[in-house]
Amino acid sequence: MYSILRRAAPLRRRAVSALAAAVLRREEAAAEVVVSRRATIPAAWFHSSPAWLGFRETGAAGAAARPQYAADEGLFYEEDKRGAKAGGVAAGGAEEGLEVAKLGISPKIVSQLASRGITKLFPIQRAVLEPAMQGKDMVGRAKTGTGKTLAFGIPILDAIIRHNEKNSPGKFPLAIVLAPTRELAKQVEREFSDSSNVETICVYGGTPISQQIRQLNYGVDVVIGTPGRVIDLLKRGALNLSEVRFVVLDEADQMLSVGFDEDVETILDRVPPKRQTLMFSATMPTWIQRLTQKYLKNPVTIDLVGEDDQKLAEGISLYSIASEGHAKPAVLGELIKEHAKGGKCIVFTQTKRDADRLSYTMGRSFQCQALHGDITQAQRERTLKGFREGHFNILIATDVAARGLDIPNVDLVIHFELPNSSELFVHRSGRTGRAGKKGKAIVMHSYQQSRAIRMVENDVGCKFTELPKINVEGSDLMSGGFDSFGGGGFGREGGGSYGRRGSFGSSSSRGGGFGDSGFGRSGGGFGRSGGGGFGRSSGGGFGDSGFGRSGGGGFGDSGFGRSGGGGYGDSGFGSSGGGSGRSGFGRSGGFGDSGSGRFGGGFGNSGSGSFGNFGGNNSGQSGGFGSS
């Protein structure tokens, strides 16, 4: 039954459709039956040449004859049914790219790629294709953003399609692709499913594992996922790797950096020894070299970076600009207006907190969203979908988005802080200028970091154009200067709640709501000098020693208000001393203003003005929420 349903693809793509799910429930018992594949898949099943290619060349002779490929070589196949001739690349062939229609791959793939406007391959794709189609193990070092996903995808998809045309599709996967992040895994899965009708599944944490188990029971051709979730599925017995013939490690160095090294080795130990392994990495640390020696057999090395070559993709223009902290959001706004011109822009920050704060500040003038590790998976997917579809054009992200995300047509990347390493600069900047398109990357730095800019230039082999200083005095974003967020909470001395001076309108510009070192400190009360509520030091709810201390304070101390302060307690809703809490939501400003709403609380007692009219020096006195 599952075999019949699988041939009904693309009814189900990326997840089990409602119809398929209903059929699965009715046929649950039948779905447990595993249709074994026919004889072991031939080693050269993916090559239509009459010459037997073997899964790998072995022996000294084969190793000696093995070529090492580079981007500037004309990579066509030997004369065979694919129609290409050795040495048939003209001098400009490498520049023009290799035509997909001449590869001799399945017409289904050619048609799908053509529908996406892909008719030629870029250098990494051209360099990878020949050894991959010949079944050779491979280690590829490539520039970021040059389309390597399609490079290893085409040979795998072609192999699976040809196999399924000759054999009944089985239940267990023929290929597995490991990626360090869920975003990269989803990108790879999307590339595979958009290029053919093979059955794929993307597995990663943060989503119900039961749904992934059901889909695996249904039968898939390719598993793409993060090592952690793959290990979980293996432990549950839901994933069987006994028929895997292709293994891909994408962004392998990043799997090491996020702690997946042991999981990767466990997975490699579980796949059959007779397989083709393709590994791609921007860098080659010791762990990558050890993996190569242990798990790859006579691998072809493809280095499209080189020690002296520029590591950024071509077409990215680089700029730098000096800016001090308090003015940075305003400068950022001007950069976006000038260089993005309404197009897509990604702004990278160092921390999750900075991404949230900057998103809030920039949201006053731009359509933007934050993306970082604390955002739920569902929200992250909605954010990425909205950005791709143009519902908003500015994404403020941490480095979770710096590697592997395929977001088309990003016009501008801005490094809000100088990256910690040249390598990180490359990965961040690689979000623009992808697949041969033009893009810009701008680094914002302090005047003291000019030397660090020179170091990046030396390491990467690039040159920044220094932009002139931008005058942002009077900008709407200056009042929400990044420094005003302060440290230890959304606010600090000198800056108000969410960065406004004096919070919700205080005259003192002191003691920021949502405070410093905890929800409000030093002058608390949603931004009031010396007043209570949500603060500390002379009355601060949500502050020190319970919900308020020292001088009585809204949501108070010792029973929602102390030392003469009404607040939801003492003296009711404010008789003789402050509606909703004297020295809290009431006295000396409560929600803001120095001198407003003092004495005479209540929601409308003569001369009251409790709540302080949300700000304004001396505003709300004898008034506020309606008194005569």
UniProtKB/Swiss-Prot annotation:
EC number: 3.6.4.13
Positions of region (Disordered): 496-548, 571-628
GO CC entries: cytoplasm
Compositional bias ranges of the Low complexity kind: 500-509
Keyword annotations from UniProtKB, A to Z: ATP-binding, Helicase, Hydrolase, Nucleotide-binding, RNA-binding
Catalytic activity entry: ATP + H2O = ADP + phosphate + H(+)
SMART domains assigned: DEXDc, HELICc
GO-annotated molecular function: ATP binding; ATP hydrolysis activity; RNA binding; RNA helicase activity
Any GO BP: Group II intron splicing
Ranges where the Helicase ATP-binding domain occurs: 129-302
The protein, known as: DEAD-box ATP-dependent RNA helicase 9
Comment block on domains: The Q motif is unique to and characteristic of the DEAD box family of RNA helicases and controls ATP binding and hydrolysis.
Binding-site residues for ATP, renumbered to this chain: 142-149
Nucleotide-binding listed as a keyword: yes
Biased composition (Gly residues): 510-548
Residue span of motif Q motif: 98-126
CDD domains: DEADc (cd00268), SF2_C_DEAD (cd18787)
PROSITE patterns in the record: HELICASE_ATP_BIND_1, HELICASE_CTER, Q_MOTIF
Key word RNA-binding present: yes
